[in-house]
Amino acid sequence: MILLVDADSLIFASCYKKRENPEDDKYYRNIEDAQAKFDEQFMSIVNKLEDMYPVERVITFSGSKGNFRKLITSDYKANRKKQELPPLLNEMHQYVKDQYDSVWGYGIETDDMVARYWYELSNELGRDNVMIVSID
């Protein structure tokens, strides 16, 4: 089994810490804390899947930039509210690119990149041998 992991949402979530009190900071400010949270969650997912399937390879995807759909229509994702981004988000994307050798591209969203790899690999190896892992 080949796992194709869309890590963007996991990266985003790893920037947030559990707050004990409402006034506590919601973000990690120390990159090592965010990295540890990502690593723990990522490996938990992979380990659970390895318990169920014979995983041969894990390909991680994250941090793609731009989107061809925005060139086609300016309304693409226009209904989304502007949201404050976690301060360590860019550093975390770079960490995952470096540490997990993640696949990314320009002009395409990460989930589209995952779908393209799934299509190519499932045609080559069979649909039962390739799994997309994503929370979005």
Name each region found by the language model.
Residues 130-136:
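Conserved RecA-like ASCE P-loop NTPase motor core of nucleic-acid helicases/translocases
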